[in-house]
């Protein structure tokens, strides 16, 4: 009898494989052989940080807009499907993968699967992201404008001292100060953290928040795993691999957010309190959440806003260092008689967002079980299927973006100076912040910081004479993009 158990197990496995290959509702969808019956393929490329590149190549190999990447999961590289998946009727629901982005017992605004839970919190803080509110803090006396001025000044000092600068580290310092200063009312102090050190010494001292942020980004390599397995791996990893640097980084961030909630003056008060209060105050007073949750939600927005915006800003500045013609054109526009008509500035930022991708991989959703399914071209995907579009695929579609891996901001111009690069469908293929009701709540703040910083940097001419220390930016394609080596160095000649 015992000898039958292994045989029975083998038969059951073979039956499951045959079902997934030939009888599953997705059996008609092309994809790699292993991916058609096992999730191991998808987990492997996710872990290695090559998911976006591999899936793009497979879409090309199989000549399909719909690619089977796991037994019940597909990748979609058709911008026509974006509206149906993410926008109409609030979009498809998020899948269980997002539970892995919870903050321990706290469900964040981003990770919430419950729309009502998310909406109550998002609506409470939405006024902070209004364009008018952001513009008010973008002048010389505002927190956003003040942080940007300090950022440019530090770049200038590095240039005058004849030393290089790490754009990634500097942009991280700027972003964390903008996010905390504007949303929480106290700056983290990233830009001033090493101000007491000589310029040369500052190069080896990176932002204190980075070790913890990098560890969180890296753990998204496991984000596709079932939640219980993810929890086990996360807790095991915390016990085995956490080092003193990561622990100290976390403790400093934790102390900062606790100080913010306690209303202490440990951080620098940077602006008049906005109507209705700061981010954490609005969550407590208007969403009715606990102080513990408000602290966790504040840490979440700090991480999400500071890290992703830093990556995108560093990407834009990196390409501007390499593109003297773009800098010259921008300078003329910034100093023109009509600076409000910043067409080329908008084009530069858009092109940076296209290449910078804070989230390069699929933003997964579930086809509603109560609906008729999802049709993409001639392919019908049944209810319950996990679907998703990846920014990496859409942003590098050569039919929409000729020369897709090159920084060509002129492609966004509609005044006849696009050099033949402009194509229909570019706007709907751009998803740098996600789309629909679950798009990034902080995208207006990120956009304000990006536009204002580029203007200030170009107007200062601080990038003149600079060169990048590497030819191109390489990213690790986890859920959050991670720039390889965590640095983008420039030097002045």
Curated annotation (Swiss-Prot):
Transmembrane segments: 3-23, 301-321
UniProt KW keywords: Heme, Iron, Membrane, Metal-binding, Monooxygenase, Oxidoreductase, Transmembrane, Transmembrane helix
Record's subcellular location: Membrane
Pathway the protein contributes to: Secondary metabolite biosynthesis; terpenoid biosynthesis
EC number(s) reported in the record: 1.-.-.-
Membrane-related topology note: Multi-pass membrane protein
Cofactors demanded by this protein: heme
Binding locations of heme: 440
SUPFAM superfamilies cross-referenced by the UniProt entry: Cytochrome P450
Family: Belongs to the cytochrome P450 family.
Family matches, as PANTHER family: CYTOCHROME P450, P450, PUTATIVE (EUROFUNG)-RELATED
Function: Cytochrome P450 monooxygenase; part of the gene cluster that mediates the biosynthesis of the phthalide-terpenoid hybrid 11'-O-desmethylfendlerol. The biosynthesis of 11'-O-desmethylfendlerol begins with the NR-PKS mfmB that forms 3,5-dimethylorsellinic acid (DMOA), which is then transformed into the phthalide 5,7-dihydroxy-4-(hydroxymethyl)-6-methylphthalide by the cytochrome P450 monooxygenase mfmA and the hydrolase mfmC.
Protein name: Cytochrome P450 monooxygenase mfmF
UniProt organism field: Annulohypoxylon moriforme (Filamentous fungus)
Gene that this polypeptide is encoded by: mfmF
């Amino acid at each position: 009898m015992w000898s039958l158990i292994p045989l029975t197990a083998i038969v059951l496995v073979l039956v499951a494989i045959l079902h997934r290959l030939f009888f599953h509702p997705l059996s008609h969808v092309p994809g790699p052989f292993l991916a058609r019956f096992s999730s191991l393929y998808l987990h492997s490329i996710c872990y290695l940080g090559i998911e976006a590149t591999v899936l793009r190549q497979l879409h090309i190999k199989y000549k399909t807009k719909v690619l089977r990447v796991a037994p019940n999961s597909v990748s979609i590289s058709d911008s026509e499907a974006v509206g149906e998946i993410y926008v109409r009727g609030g979009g498809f629901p998020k899948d269980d993968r997002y539970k892995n982005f919870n903050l321990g017992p706290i469900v964040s605004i981003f990770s919430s699967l419950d729309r009502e839970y998310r909406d109550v919190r998002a609506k409470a803080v939405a006024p902070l992201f209004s364009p008018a509110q952001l513009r008010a803090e973008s002048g010389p006396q505002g927190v956003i404008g003040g942080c940007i001025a300090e950022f440019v000044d530090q770049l200038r000092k590095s240039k005058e001292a004849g030393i290089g600068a790490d754009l990634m580290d500097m942009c991280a310092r700027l972003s964390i100060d903008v996010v905390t200063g504007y949303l929480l009312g106290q700056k983290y102090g990233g830009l001033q953290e090493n101000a007491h050190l000589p310029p040369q010494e500052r190069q080896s001292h990176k932002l204190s928040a980075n070790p913890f942020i990098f560890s969180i980004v890296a753990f998204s390599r496991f984000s596709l795993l079932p939640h219980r397995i993810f929890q086990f791996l996360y807790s095991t990893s915390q016990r085995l691999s956490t080092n003193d640097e990561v622990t100290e980084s976390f403790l400093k961030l934790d102390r900062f957010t606790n100080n913010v909630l306690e209303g202490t003056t440990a951080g620098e008060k940077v602006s008049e309190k906005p109507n209705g209060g700061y981010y954490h105050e609005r969550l407590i007073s208007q969403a009715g959440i606990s102080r513990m949750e408000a602290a966790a939600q504040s840490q979440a927005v700090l991480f999400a806003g500071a890290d992703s915006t830093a990556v995108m800003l560093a990407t834009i500045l990196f390409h501007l260092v390499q593109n003297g013609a773009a800098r010259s054109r921008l300078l003329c526009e910034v100093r023109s008689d009509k600076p409000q008509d910043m067409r080329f500035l908008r084009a530069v930022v858009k092109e940076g967002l296209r290449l910078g991708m804070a989230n390069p991989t699929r933003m997964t959703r579930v086809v509603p079980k109560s609906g008729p399914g999802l049709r993409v071209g001639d392919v019908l995907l049944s209810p319950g299927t996990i679907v998703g579009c990846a920014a990496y695929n859409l942003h590098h579609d050569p039919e929409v973006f000729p020369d897709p891996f090159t920084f060509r901001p002129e492609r966004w111009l509609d005044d006849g100076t696009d050099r033949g690069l402009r194509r229909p469908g570019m706007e709907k293929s751009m998803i740098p912040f996600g789309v629909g009701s679950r798009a990034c709540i902080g995208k207006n703040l990120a956009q304000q910081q990006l536009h204002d910083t580029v203007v200030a940097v170009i107007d200062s001419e601080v990038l003149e004479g600079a060169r990048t220390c590497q030819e191109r930016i390489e990213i690790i394609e986890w859920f959050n993009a991670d720039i390889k080596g965590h640095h983008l160095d420039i030097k002045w000649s």
